[in-house]
Amino acid sequence: MAREYARTDRVGQQIQKEIATILMREIKDPRLSMTTVSAVEVTRDLAYAKIFVTFFNDNQDEIKASLEVLAEAEGYIRSLLGKRLRARIMPHLRFVYDSSMSEGVRMSALVDQAVASDKNGDAEVDDTQVDDEPSVDSEKGE
């Protein structure tokens, strides 16, 4: 059972490597320039492969257009992949935008912003804590 999962992982890694090479060398569409294959998930029966791609540009319209180009070229990419891989079954390809990179950049920016606001806000918090302490003590006495 464990070997079956290892095989899908190996096939996925090989597909990732070959599709990255195909996109870089064989596909001449300018809308697909700077396309990166970030991951590949292959089903257990090797019938389907989900290819996660990222693009240099984060514009949503251009991402949709690039995904449409990849969907149209799926048959051609699959035939080139079939020539390069020695596999009995060549999986059907489905290209999906991998938003994890842009989400990671967004989260990092939010953390940096929070750290910067904490540094600026610490001095203000210290001043307010000193002013508020007598009123808290007077409330306890009542």
Swiss-Prot record:
Q: Which GO terms describe its cellular component?
A: cytosol
Composition bias type Acidic residues, residue spans:
123-136
Q: Please tell me whether the keyword Translocase is annotated for this protein.
A: no
Q: By its UniProt entry, which Gene3D superfamilies does this protein fall under? A: 3.30.300.20
What's a single GO MF annotation on this record? Answer: ribosomal small subunit binding
Please give the chief subcellular localization of this protein. cytoplasm
Please provide the record's keywords in A-Z order. Answer: Cytoplasm, Ribosome biogenesis
Q: Where in or outside the cell is it found?
A: Cytoplasm
The UniProt annotation puts the region (Disordered) at 118-142
* One Gene Ontology term from the biological process aspect of the record: maturation of SSU-rRNA
Q: Which NCBIfam families match?
A: rbfA
Assembly, in brief, is:
Monomer. Binds 30S ribosomal subunits, but not 50S ribosomal subunits or 70S ribosomes.
Q: Tell me which family the UniProt entry assigns to this protein.
A: Belongs to the RbfA family.
Q: What's its job?
A: One of several proteins that assist in the late maturation steps of the functional core of the 30S ribosomal subunit. Associates with free 30S ribosomal subunits (but not with 30S subunits that are part of 70S ribosomes or polysomes). Required for efficient processing of 16S rRNA. May interact with the 5'-terminal helix region of 16S rRNA.
Identify this protein by name.
Ribosome-binding factor A
- Give the gene that encodes this protein: rbfA
